[in-house]
Amino acid sequence: MDFIQKAAQTVLPGPDTSMLVITTVVTTASLYTILNRIIYPRRPSVLQNPLSSHISSLSPEEQSQLLYPPDYFPGARDVPTPYGSIRCYEFGPVSGRKVLLIHGISTSCMTLTHIAHGLVERGCRVLLFDLFGRGYSDGVGDLPHDERLYVSQALCVLASSELAWTGQGEEEGFHLVGYSLGGGIAAHLAATFPSTVKSLILLAPAGMIREENFGIVAKVIFRSGWVPEGIVEIMTRWRLKRPIAESAKRKSKGGPSGPSTPKSHLPGDQAIEATVTSEIADAAVAEAPGPLQRQVLKYVNWQVANHAGFVPAFMSTLRYAPMINQHEAWRKLAKREPKTTCFIFGIGDEIVNDEDYRQDVLPLVGGEENVFWARSVPGGHDFPMAHPDQTLERIWRFWGWDEGVAASWVKT
């Protein structure tokens, strides 16, 4: 019996050892749980926009001082949907030509400020909205931010209007303007509903950016899905907080091009660096960026700090959105009525290269006899903000509103 007791004491740990083992197991399990939640975060289906999480606590005076106040455009409304709330703005003459505008990846629809007001001045009825996870639209935490989600969002916005936007008759339907990522989304919307979209205007559109412009590092980090989402989020937050500094480095190394200088290609991962900041990249290095560009630059940082859905939406957009290899959708644009699709590019744009698009896209959409390939606008990827008058002149020409306007174009 004594032998058995001694054996048991030898095999079984004492009280101190047992406590150490238990503590180690509990600590390890806790650390694993914490790290797992950081590396593989579980997000709610709806990520609240700043209107409910931040803006509601501000006084009217404080709200008026925001970079993007809730009443930035006239006709603001919030549209409830199964995906969350969508902020949109509708203004201009009720009987005017209806124009839906879709903005790019980095900011709210404020990037299209000058274009929207210019259209209204010419008698158009405009409708803008903040893409999910930007501005005052909720973020979507449990779905990929691909063309299906964004086209569905646009349809929800159109359906929310008191006016009829989606008819297919000769005097019905709407005209569509897409900028950068918004151009890639607009191409899918027009390809799916060709008779509803009366004319399609693509401003430096994503969708057919050459895949080789995404370097190996960028592909692995942002698009492959191999890097844990939590780590990508940390890297993305860091990158989005530094657009001015990083773009200034690019300028000191010889890029990007000046406002009227023909664009050059950025190698590999530098191209994705520019794409990451998209609309704001050129504004950051401009010799004298305008008030809107400066405002947009600051607003990106504000979104990182105050919009729970912004960084997740940005990450998902880089991975899933229609930015490259959209050949199937773009081929459908060739079936549109001739000369109802317009392409406008910036001369110094290193992100969406008009020469690449001329080679890769023009054959897909039916050639120059089928589309309106406008003369390039001065400036880089931010040309709708930096050179709105020249951009609008191309639009008037496309619509046939000003036959003599070409003489007033800036020489390029």
Q: Where would I find each of the regions flagged by the language model?
A:
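Catalytic active-site module of serine/aspartate enzymes centered on a nucleophile-bearing elbow/loop
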Residues: 2-18, 367-412
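An N-terminal hydrophobic leader/cap segment in hydrolases
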Residues: 19-78
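Active-site loop/oxyanion-hole signature of alpha/beta-hydrolase fold enzymes
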Residues: 77, 131-177, 193
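Conserved HGGG/HGGXW glycine-rich cap/lid loop of the alpha/beta-hydrolase fold
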Residues: 80-136
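Gly/Ala-rich beta-loop-alpha elbow adjacent to hydrolase catalytic centers
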Residues: 178-182, 186
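Flexible "cap/lid" loop of the alpha/beta hydrolase fold
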Residues: 191, 196-230, 261
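Conserved alpha/beta-hydrolase catalytic His-Asp/Glu region
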Residues: 217, 231-336
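Conserved loop-alpha-helix segment in the C-terminal half of the alpha/beta-hydrolase fold
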Residues: 331-379, 390
